[in-house]
Design a protein with these regions (language model features):
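Solvent-exposed alpha-helices and their adjacent loops that cap or buttress functional pockets
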Residues: 15, 58-63, 99-100, 125-127, ...
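Rossmann-like adenosine-cofactor binding region
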Residues: 235-305, 310-312
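Glycine-rich phosphate/diphosphate-binding loop of Rossmann-like nucleotide-binding domains
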Residues: 77, 82-102, 160, 168-265
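Adenosine-phosphate binding glycine-rich loop
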Residues: 161-162, 285-389
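General beta-strand structural signal in soluble alpha/beta enzymes
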Residues: 108, 134-137, 158-161, 192, ...
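N-terminal ligand-binding/catalytic initiation module
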Residues: 1-158, 384
């Protein structure tokens, strides 16, 4: 099916159904007796019970299984700053995926503000309704402060999926790739092309998982702590990376590298640069819809494993493998935060969905529709909560 066909079908579907979601009651409302229990006068007893003990909201309302999907429409994938109304279909889609893959109810909310303080305060005002907050398509660097402030100030899980979802799945793909190329995580050299929210989150996940040698390349070149003109979020990560203090461009960074991770722009990875990498190079080219290099070009240049963000190529790095199960696990465990330990556990859970004897260079990551993905991720997250409590 062509891209044109998909776009036309998406418009037709949206017009036919008036969006992707509806609200349906769980309880019967067929008689006056039903009405008296579901609404007045019976509902007063439920409200009184929660008033006496606020925690009973998890037991007596939808809070325990409901997540807010919140965006300001400032950084919608492939579309940019399109505003709240235009972002709504994306948030609806996200909410539909939560339900389809993990049974999590979610409400899409788009905010008509791009002011950091206004977003933080609005989410805090809305938080009593929800068991968790999924932030979506909020531009960097504002997204870093918004997420961190909400994590610090709320007692429910807050997760910016654009940062962490893809990073978790890339880490899962890395775990399985290392099994095939027989290299240890602490020995590999990784180049991450893209210094935005996804690139920085991937860097932090890799560091936490044991990767010791990482170089980040942004549009200005290799990030180095010797550069005094870096913005704060780059200066902080530069202290943890580029141990060799390299300077230069992507080609320089890739000399002797084992893994390339691209969250950047179409066509920026040249085939000849792959030839400068170590034996059996691993390429994760995740720019969408056009990757940093197409798989056939990368393989012809000597790549051993290639993953992209696209469903029409092998090894799709798709964050739908992560976020439904992560929230399922966090909600079930009543976690107050989604910690780095929980995120690494999720990556390991995704990786183990493919048995070692089934791993091949074109099969390093499970399909989102593989049965039990969200369940395994949720269990992995839940176990991490137990281990850290």
């Amino acid at each position: 099916m062509s891209t044109k066909d998909v776009k036309e079908l998406a418009i037709e579907q949206a017009k036919k159904f008036g969006g992707k979601l509806e609200v349906c009651p769980k309880v019967p409302i067929e008689t006056k007796g039903d009405l008296g229990i579901a609404y007045t006068p019976g509902v007063a007893a439920v409200s009184s019970a929660i008033h006496e003990k606020k925690e009973r909201a998890y037991e007596l309302t939808t809070k325990k299984n409901t997540v807010a999907v919140i965006s300001d429409g400032s950084a919608v994938l492939g579309l940019g700053n399109i505003g709240p109304e235009a972002a709504m279909p994306v948030m609806e889609g996200k909410a539909a995926l939560f339900k389809r893959f993990a049974g999590v109810d979610s409400i899409p909310l788009v905010l008509d503000t791009q002011d950091t303080e206004e977003i933080i305060q609005t989410v805090k005002f809305l938080a009593p309704t929800f068991g968790g907050i999924n932030l979506e398509d909020i531009s960097a660097p504002r997204c870093f402060e918004i997420e961190q402030r909400l994590i610090d100030e709320l007692d429910i899980p807050v997760f910016h999926d654009d940062q962490h979802g893809t990073a978790i799945v890339v880490l899962a793909a890395l775990y399985n790739s290392l099994k095939l190329i027989n290299k240890k995580i602490e020995d590999i050299h990784v180049v991450i092309n893209g210094g935005g929210s996804a690139g920085l989150s991937i860097t932090r996940k890799f560091l936490a998982a044991g990767v010791k040698h990482i170089i980040i390349v942004d549009r200005t070149g290799i990030l180095s702590e010797t550069d005094t003109g870096l913005p704060p979020h780059h200066a902080e990560i530069a202290k943890l990376t580029n141990r060799e203090h390299r300077t230069g461009d992507l080609a320089t960074a890739l000399e002797g590298a084992d893994v390339f991770v691209g969250v950047s722009a179409p066509g920026v990875l040249k085939p000849e640069w792959i030839q400068q990498m170590n034996e059996q190079p691993v390429i994760f080219a995740m720019a969408n819809p056009v990757p940093e290099i197409f798989p056939d070009e990368a393989l012809a240049a000597g790549a051993y494993i290639v993953g992209t963000g696209r469903s029409d190529f092998p090894n799709q790095i798709n964050n739908v493998l992560a976020f439904p199960g992560i929230f399922r696990g966090a909600l079930d465990a009543r976690a107050k935060k989604i910690t780095i330990e929980m995120q690494i556990a999720a990556a390991k859970g995704i990786a183990k969905l493919i048995p070692d004897n089934e791993l091949t260079p074109t099969n390093i990551i499970p399909d989102p529709f593989q049965e039990g993905v969200a369940k395994v991720v949720a269990e992995s997250v839940g176990n991490a909560v137990k281990e850290t409590n």
